[in-house]
Structures are given as C-alpha cells and as structure tokens.
Amino acid sequence: MKYIQTDQILDIPAGVTVNIKARSVKVTGPRGELTKELKHIDVAFTKISDRAIKITVHNGDRKHVAALRTVKSLIANLITGVTKGYKYKMRYVYAHFPINVNVVETDGQKFVEIRNFLGEKRVRQVKIFDGVTVENSTTQKDELILSGNSLEAVSQNAADIQQICRVRNKDIRKFLDGIYVSERGLINEDA
C-alpha cells in the first residue's frame, strides 16, 4: 500500500537554529554546531516557522514512511546535542589484573590507551573522534567519562572501547573483565 502524503512536525526550541539545504541539516545552538547529511533518504523539508519544521514523504510505502520518523529522531538528537550534550560513563571491571586506562595524544590525534587487560603485554588503542572529550573520573575509581555534542560520536566511541576489551576464546561467564558502559545521559540535565 502506498501512502499519498505523510508528514511529521518537529518543534525547534528557543536558542536553536536549524538550516536545511539540499537535505543537509545544520543545527546551531548554545553548545556549538552539528551537521548531518540526509541525502540518501527521500524526504522533503518545509519550514513552517522559526520554531517548527515539517518533514514530508510523498507516495511512500511502509518502509519509506518509517524512515520519516527516523529523520525526525536524528534531527531531534542533533538539537539535544547542541542544547544539552551527551555523556557516557564507563566502568573498568577486572578480577585480578587491574586495567590501566590513559588518554594519550600522538601527532595531534587523541587515543584511549588500555594496558594490562587480562595481564596482557599488548597495548590496546582506540581513536577518539573529533568533538568527544574523554577523561578519567575524579569522584569514582575505575571510571571513564565520555562527553560531547554528537550522540553518534560519543556512543560509537563508547562502543569501540567496550568492543576492543572483549574476551575471546574463554568462557565469558567466568572472565567478566572489560570496560563497560555503566550510565548514559545528558551533560546539562536542566537545560
């Protein structure tokens, strides 16, 4: 079944500007600026006012209409990023060998360096994306805090760190060592 026209209305909060040109979305807010390319999704954008945008799909089937809600969620995540920001907390879990995690900079590129994982001599490195800040927690022992404006960048960095510390060729019920996401949320909860 084809839907003749389906639309969603996205409200824009005060202090945030959204510019859309050729399906390239640019969101500017108090914390900075984010851009997202949506050229691969066939949707139309109409600016109703400075505070609202209408996203429309013409002659779309079920999957095409489902992409409409995805586009709305992606832009809403950009708006949340430039107003409040995203923060992920990760905890080190180890039974015997204490995991040593440092943030190092090499040739202008930052890395998270993981040493002594399961007592291994190998040093594991994860590249930190632009716009993401990584720091060791000052209040909690064995905790890493990732924060930034882009939900995709922060969550992908957290996933990369968790993935590089996967235990292979051993029973994962017994070997629980690793670095895991313990908490995710917003930097400014009240904004």
What residue ranges belong to the model's regions?
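Ribosome-associated RNA-binding proteins
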Residues: 1-191
